[in-house]
Amino acid sequence: MSAFSPENITGAFIPSALFVAGTFFFKQELTPFAVALAAVLVGWKVFSNKPRKVLNPGDFQHFTLKEKNDISHNVTVYRFALPRPTDILGLPIGQHISLAATIGGKEVVRSYTPISSDNEAGYFDLLVKAYPQGNISKYLTTLEVGQTMKVRGPKGAMVYTPNMCRHIGMIAGGTGITPMYQIIKAIIRNRPRNGGNDTTQVDLIFANVNPDDILMKDELEQLAKEDDGFRIYYVLNNPPEGWTGGVGFVTPDMIKERLPAPSSDIKVLLCGPPPMVSAMKKATESLGYTKARPVSKLEDQVFCF
């Protein structure tokens, strides 16, 4: 929040100015004290409204569930409140958080990437698909508004910075879209037309089983509509009649046609079900990209979340 935000102007600067003016009018000799007191008030107000990063990588904290919005029969967006309305998670672009819960007498920990960003203060959103065998995802479905969840972070090897490469290719499957969405939003928000400097080109291959499985399709389509540097190619196992996207699994030919060719100034990001990621590692290697490591590092050409 800017020091000269409307909230600070109406809540600190104007009252302080009126206080000093009133003191000068009624008791001029106390004006220096009034000025000093007003300065303290303004400083406190501005500082207290400054966004505070609340994540702690070493300790779990409890955050209260504020809202639950069902996207489909098994996909929900969970909104968790931060302690103060001006608080932010403090999550670097490309990183994720850990959620923990005691299930069956044991503590279970899973990683998730928020679909919200630090531009949105006071809360964070998680898009979660409930799987039959998913411990934390099933636990979240039982969580009621007002109850808390244990959260720790940030974590992860990916920290996106503007123009870290010329062109990014992305391959996502299912809920693997969440870290991609976070990065795509950050890039487009930081375009020169928006006052930033990020000129990175982005191509996304997004694979799903059925049309209804395409998560955040409206949001992705809107981003692609407003930014000609971002393109999407959908792949479905069970496409509807008249489908013009990809069919079946993501193939090397699709990657070759849709994503940037191997080069020192590009990256390919992978996120999705383990069998898919494993297949994409082999496919990218066969196309001449640097072989993906078992555990990815930031400098890798092919990075797996």
Curated annotation (Swiss-Prot):
UniProt keyword annotations, A-Z: FAD, Flavoprotein, Membrane, Mitochondrion, Mitochondrion outer membrane, NAD, Oxidoreductase, Transferase, Transmembrane, Transmembrane helix
Recorded catalytic activity of this chain's protein: 2 Fe(III)-[cytochrome b5] + NADH = 2 Fe(II)-[cytochrome b5] + NAD(+) + H(+); 2 Fe(3+)-[Dph3] + NADH = 2 Fe(2+)-[Dph3] + NAD(+) + H(+)
Subcellular localization, as worded in the UniProt entry: Mitochondrion outer membrane
GO BP: protein histidyl modification to diphthamide; tRNA wobble base 5-methoxycarbonylmethyl-2-thiouridinylation
UniProt: FAD binding residues: 141-156, 167-204
S-S pairs: none
Biochemical pathway: Protein modification; peptidyl-diphthamide biosynthesis
GO CC annotations on file: endoplasmic reticulum; mitochondrial outer membrane
Any Pfam family matching the protein: FAD_binding_6
EC number: 1.6.2.2
Cofactor(s), by name: FAD
Subunit structure: Monomer. Component of the 2-(3-amino-3-carboxypropyl)histidine synthase complex composed of dph1, dph2, dph3 and a NADH-dependent reductase, predominantly cbr1.
Similarity section: Belongs to the flavoprotein pyridine nucleotide cytochrome reductase family.
Identification of the protein by name: NADH-cytochrome b5 reductase 1
Organism: Aspergillus niger (strain ATCC MYA-4892 / CBS 513.88 / FGSC A1513)
Classification of source organism: Eukaryota, Fungi, Dikarya, Ascomycota, Pezizomycotina
Gene (name only): cbr1
